[in-house]
Amino acid sequence: MTKTTLQIVKEMEQALERAEVDCSDYFHDDFDWVANFGCGTKRGLDEFERAWYKPFRDAFGDRHFATEHYLEDGNWAACFGHCEATHHGDFMGIAPTGKRIKIPYIDFWRVEDGKIAENRVSVDFPAILAQLGQDIFN
């Protein structure tokens, strides 16, 4: 039975929560990750894992994704919510605080041939930094 776009996205989210290191079961090798300033754009699964997923995983442990709503339209899925995590590693120059924080996000996923080919994401960095004691607006 063929999985729906939404099933693939939800399975990937569950794998990231479990901190599975090999993302190749969920993402194409030439996967594009396009994010707001602070995350940047990552071309290919290797760059995504090396330059975003691993540093994020190392900085924030005990992750739980609390996605509030999903939408699906053909080979596209979208969601918004937050990731609850404990800050236990360096993040954007901030030493570990041990704080449990919420990381707000919005994601748009494109699935091709049963794997994620593209992710457009917005992460609320001002909200993250404020929870870590850095108010960038003051």
What are these regions (language model features)?
Residues 1-29, 135-138:
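Short, low-complexity N-terminal intrinsically disordered segments enriched in polar/charged residues
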Residues 3, 11-15, 51, 68-69, ...:
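A structural feature that tracks compact, well-ordered secondary-structure segments
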Residues 70-78, 110-117:
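A short, structured loop/turn motif at beta-sheet edges
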Residues 78-80, 92:
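Intrinsic, low-complexity N-terminal interaction/targeting segments
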Residues 81-83, 121-122:
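Short, well-ordered beta-to-alpha junction loops that form the rim of enzyme active sites
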Residues 6-8, 21, 25-75, 82-84:
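A solvent-exposed, acidic/Ser-Thr-rich amphipathic alpha-helical stretch
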Residues 86-112:
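Exposed beta-sheet edge and beta->alpha loop/turn motif
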Residues 118-138:
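Low-complexity, intrinsically disordered terminal/linker segments enriched in charged
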